[in-house]
């Protein structure tokens, strides 16, 4: 059940990222790595604000990052992120 919820949330996150309009500005068309680009945090939460069985400790504390060079220790790859035309690795812990 937890795995199904986690996978559903990640699929919804992927659809949301793809639904954002692509804006080609001068900053986004540069291919060199910008400082801080390696640690772009994405917070994922589950359930309603009043609390439910979906808001267990393990699910509420899920933190994901869009990384350029792969996942760090204690993180696992959960897919890809896209910002403009650049693709990143989605790493969660």
From Swiss-Prot:
Tissue: Paneth cells of the small bowel.
One Pfam entry name: Defensin_1
PROSITE patterns: DEFENSIN (PS00269)
GO CC, one annotated term: extracellular space
Origin: domain of life: Eukaryota
InterPro entries for this protein: Alpha-defensin (IPR016327), Alpha-defensin_C (IPR006081), Alpha-defensin_N (IPR002366), Beta/alpha-defensin_C (IPR006080)
Keyword Repeat among UniProt keywords: no
SUPFAM superfamilies for the chain: Defensin-like
Region (Disordered): 22-56
Endpoints of the signal sequence: 1-19
Family named by the database record: Belongs to the alpha-defensin family.
Annotated function: Probably contributes to the antimicrobial barrier function of the small bowel mucosa.
Name of the protein in question: Alpha-defensin 7
Species of origin: Mus musculus
């Amino acid at each position: 059940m937890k795995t199904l919820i986690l996978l559903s949330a990640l699929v919804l996150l992927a659809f949301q990222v793809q639904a954002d309009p692509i804006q080609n500005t001068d900053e986004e068309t540069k291919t060199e790595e910008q400082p801080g680009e390696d640690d772009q945090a994405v917070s994922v939460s589950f359930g309603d604000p009043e609390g439910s069985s979906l808001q267990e400790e393990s699910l509420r504390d899920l933190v994901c990052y869009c990384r350029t060079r792969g996942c760090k220790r204690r993180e696992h790859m959960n897919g890809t992120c896209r910002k403009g035309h650049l693709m990143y690795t989605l790493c969660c812990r």
